[in-house]
């Protein structure tokens, strides 16, 4: 019986060696990937503005008629769906604001970007998955990209300041230059790049305003500069580019006699509420005081024809939103164009999002071009939850558990890009293991035990 014991000892040594568990390929043989998000770019923003660079990208690559974001259609939740492939109830970033119903702490959007425990709550985004499989990743202003996940930070990251000017076109180009250097000088494989427009302009002036149209022209010029930069850095044949967004935008209805105002509802009082998250577009959450859930629900369920109020367990499953411990016992949203006012009226935006993701004004864009994508292809609409699986395929990495389906977007790719290399498992760079670090000690212990038993038998 010494022969099997020797073989198992060799297997144990192999498992402990660097790169065990994965076929080997040389560094640099996989195409790189750049995911760009222009916040709040509604699906039809290119239809009332001349956008020659976005049009050229569609001719050279793939265009979706539109993309359906996750619900709730907010910036951070929808961006995290893109990089995890999970619906919001499953990845847990349920709001732009960090909140705690026990301490009553609520933090605004920019502060929440740096709250590690808000983001790192069980889901592993694509940056970390890529790095664990031997790649190098970067995040430039992308929501969630500057905190650690299970103790791992993104290779390179930048976070904007609280008073950041999202409109500065000169800075946009400088940011692109930095990202190109990350690819060429630091050999990053994946970068996510975020721009805060046309969302800010849409909020301030409204989606039908001339200011929004001018901002879309700026976005288009930036797309042109980006593609020129890719060519100038000799990346055209080895970098796949995806341009998308988190959600759309709609015009806010400000008619004084038709507002959704909690402080004017006759049978409702904030004295029954332990915690509230209101005055954030069309969405709201309430934690009633103990024993007052039914009273609050009865007061609100028919309080306004444009307001939809649900107990958590009755919230429509199609939204894939409410089944998360961070969601309060009562939650609500309003119809398209209506925002929810709480104790006083503090919302004055002309444009807003956060509405039902089935509303066309919440739909957004998807464009892709590069060596893996077909040219001149327009595809039918799809959900943003599928983009993660596509990106993992483009990078040649094994995805985490997710809610997307790779088959949904495979028709975008050339046949050779749609299939695993030679039908074999995903290849990893030299010196890295496909086995998660947490699983290797268990395998080692199992093999050691087998070796000892066989030695005793012998």
From Swiss-Prot:
The keyword Amino-acid biosynthesis does not apply. It is found in: Cell membrane. Residues 72-78 are annotated as: Required for enzyme activity. Keywords: Cell membrane, Glycoprotein, Hydrolase, Lipid metabolism, Membrane, Metal-binding, Signal, Transmembrane, Transmembrane helix, Zinc. Zn(2+) 1 binds at residues 39, 75, 246-247. Its EC number is 3.1.4.12. Substrate binds at residue 96. Pfam families: Phosphodiest. Choline-specific phosphodiesterase that hydrolyzes sphingomyelin releasing the ceramide and phosphocholine and therefore is involved in sphingomyelin digestion, ceramide formation, and fatty acid (FA) absorption in the gastrointestinal tract. Also has phospholipase C activity and can also cleave phosphocholine from palmitoyl lyso-phosphatidylcholine and platelet-activating factor (PAF) leading to its inactivation. Does not have nucleotide pyrophosphatase activity. This is Ectonucleotide pyrophosphatase/phosphodiesterase family member 7. It comes from Homo sapiens (Human). The gene is ENPP7.
